[in-house]
Amino acid sequence: MAQYDIRKQYLDFFASKSHKVYDSMPLVPDDASLLFTNAGMVQFKDIFTGKIPIPAPPRATSSQLCIRAGGKHNDLENVGYTARHHTLFEMLGNFSFGDYFKKEAIAYAWEFVTQVLGFSKDVLYVTIHESDDEAYELWCEHIEPSRIKRMGDKDNFWQMGDSGPCGPCSEIYVDQGEKYFQSDEDYFGGEGDRFLEIWNLVFMQFEQKGGVRTLLPKPSIDTGMGLERVIALKEGKINNFDTSLFAPLMQCLQKLTNKTYFGDDEIFDRLDLQEAEMIKIKNIQASFRVIADHARSVAFLLAQGVNFDKEGRGYVLRRILRRAVRHGYLLGLKKPFLWQVVEVVCESMGVHYSYLQERKRAIKEQCKNEEERFFETIESGMTLFSTELEKLQSAVQTQKQEILFSGEVAFKLYDTYGFPLDLTQDMLRERHIQVDMQAFEQCMNEQKSRSKASWKGSGDALKEGDFNALLSKFGENKFVGYESNKETCKIKALLDSQFKMVDTLSPSSQGWVMLDKTPFYPESGGPVGDKGALYSTNRILQSAQAQKFAQVLDTQKFFGLNLSQIEALSALKVGQEVFAEVDSIRFEIAKHHSATHLLHLALRTILGSHIAQAGSLVQPHRLRFDFSHPKALTNEEITHIENLVNEQILQSNAQLCENMDMQQAKAKGAMALFGEKYGERVRVVSFGDSIELCGGIHVNNTAEIGSFYIVKESGVSSGVRRIEAVCGNAAYHYGKNALLELSRARESLKAQDVLQGIEKIKMQLNEAKEKANKAKQSVKSLDYEEINGVRLIVLKLDSVSANEAKEIIDRSKNENESVAILLLSESNNKISIVAGVKNAPLKAGAWVKQVAQELGGNGGGRDDFATAGGKDIDKISQALNLAKDIATKALQ
């Protein structure tokens, strides 16, 4: 099978390049920060970060099993509905630890892709970081410069975190062709799926610390390539689930359900399908894919010792299984079945992962037992779900506003019938309905024993008992940073990086400090935690001799305690007096935080009172605000919202901060935010008409915010929109960059008025489209000759794209009983050839191939339709004559 061949080819190739082959590490990593192993570099993380010595040889390669179904990397909800998402996948990777770098990494990748995998360089493209001239020059030794695209940090810069190794990356793409990909975004660099990324080469050449990047003395290489994607490309499939890798699972499901599974390419060719039939096939297809994917995760997690549980990794496993069972239920499977699919996983993948075969019996039994537990309640749960849904649909018909699925019912499904929340949300997503999360969370909070999902956290060994011991010993440490960002404090407690109490912290070590009172505000409700420094107490006198004891990296609140994460610059000890000073970036955070309040008010004013905050992030350089709203905002709405926020800023409203009872706050009209916990006494922050419960840091007057720009509006999920915006210094730089881009646009368009320049280009495009339309409409008038009852058409058409030529061919085939047609067009020094044959003794694939070779190109396709390309423009006349000669001989 392809999976074994490609995996072996990859590992053998890099072994021949002096790499040591490493086995796939366990899916449960020895890394407190991770829920599951989610990338090939995880087992080498300590080498990259310098925690352990570089091994010999300093080169490694592996095929790593990865899980992405919880925590930061969670693809669970996308599985089954996209071509590439999986909860479990294999990542092929090669790594260099201070040994070879870009030149060899690029050369190895090119050699493997072209010589081992056999991809033609004509279908390969590459992206690099916009600043990486070295990578550009190296790639130019292998590929045409026109196939190299520079991208920004978002796409082509990798970093492990806020600190540590980082660097630019380069990605290799494969052009899957235009047959199945014909959207406006299907161009290299577009959002379409035609150009598929298969390999990411990360060049770790920097060390990032405190926002500063310095060159590493020994740069390293980290690469990753998805095995499932490579198999799909090699087998000519446009969806990973349609490959030989998943074929045994699809065959098993077809037998179990007595339903047929169609691949994406099969559906594409079924032009006779009605919409209702297509929807039915797509739903079956999605359920098959969910089950097949989840069966793999269940098999491997059980095999590696993860058990079904109410929390942690075991709960993620339970969620995966129950989501698969629910999709089986949709297919008519009303008794345990997944264990049979899991058995096929063990058999098909056990050839390479022998422990699947060895533990197959236990895996099947565990899976079947868990299924039986869920099937005991699924019928009752589905009845409850359907009953609530009927009520909801009746309400929708009588009320125009958005109706939410009862949070109480969702909780009952979870608590009584074992339906994980995301399973209920998954069932509702198909109907474009959301759960009332506020009501659900209220029920969850009342059920304390079920309120903790440990997989949500970072994985650090935070135990409530440890912090309660600190709390009972010292009490809460008071936050004093509202009035000042500086304070003389005493160190009450020190904790090392593993949260163990210590008496001292040595220089260069990281840990956590608890001050008796603190000016550092913890991360809460959106704003990131304060940073800063700890100095000797003579800092208060602005003494030049003041010593800097520690850098404050972050501030968090754990079980009522304000703790600051620090990096000690000199020895620190419990009881020591220090002068704590907050970094000046707090003012930029405060600007964005206050702007978030004004944005919330503007959204409710412009869009309506249904707007509710669904999440936020406030940083020194930007803000992100998620809110409930059923549809995308129009440009006009965005402009109104932005203008209203700026109007509030210009009103120079002073901050009014009051502490009062919750009932008083509600009577005042203060907005309480979803997900926040409030006591009996609350802090109310007001700026004019904006009144919210908030404990955070704000500007004293809205005028301090400066200006406000909305950078982006997008969808997060069904019924939730997101606005990203900037203000203060970030807004100044945003505006400056916008003016620079406008200037560049003028230069590019060669027009002082950008809009006029764009209109001119649009007119030119419309003229070209008109020419193309005329060509499409003149099918019946195309020059032709009749040979033995077959209409033969061989023509060169101007201003016609390959897609438009295909439309002409399709129309000719529809309008003629027997036809052989070949159209040739030339654009940008490239020649496109498209051919179609209907009821004629001529094969389109062979026809275009011979013509393309005459033009210095290549191509092919089916007997009834084929495409090709060429580059020798001066041979177009000879190529047309050749096309006629080939067809004439075949038809006589």
Curated annotation (Swiss-Prot):
Q: What is known of its domains?
A: Consists of three domains; the N-terminal catalytic domain, the editing domain and the C-terminal C-Ala domain. The editing domain removes incorrectly charged amino acids, while the C-Ala domain, along with tRNA(Ala), serves as a bridge to cooperatively bring together the editing and aminoacylation centers thus stimulating deacylation of misacylated tRNAs.
Catalytic activity, EC: 6.1.1.7
**Gene giving rise to this polypeptide:** alaS
Entry annotated with the keyword Ubl conjugation:
no
Q: Where in the cell is it found?
A: Cytoplasm
Q: What does this protein do?
A: Catalyzes the attachment of alanine to tRNA(Ala) in a two-step reaction: alanine is first activated by ATP to form Ala-AMP and then transferred to the acceptor end of tRNA(Ala). Also edits incorrectly charged Ser-tRNA(Ala) and Gly-tRNA(Ala) via its editing domain.
From which organism does this entry originate?
Helicobacter hepaticus (strain ATCC 51449 / 3B1)
Q: Which reaction does it catalyse?
A: tRNA(Ala) + L-alanine + ATP = L-alanyl-tRNA(Ala) + AMP + diphosphate
The UniProt keyword set, sorted, is: Aminoacyl-tRNA synthetase, ATP-binding, Cytoplasm, Ligase, Metal-binding, Nucleotide-binding, Protein biosynthesis, RNA-binding, tRNA-binding, Zinc
What is any Pfam family matched here? tRNA_SAD
What is the protein name for this chain? Alanine--tRNA ligase
Would you identify the family this protein belongs to, as annotated?
Answer: Belongs to the class-II aminoacyl-tRNA synthetase family.
Where does the chain bind Zn(2+)? 593, 597, 694, 698
Q: How is the cofactor bound?
A: Binds 1 zinc ion per subunit.
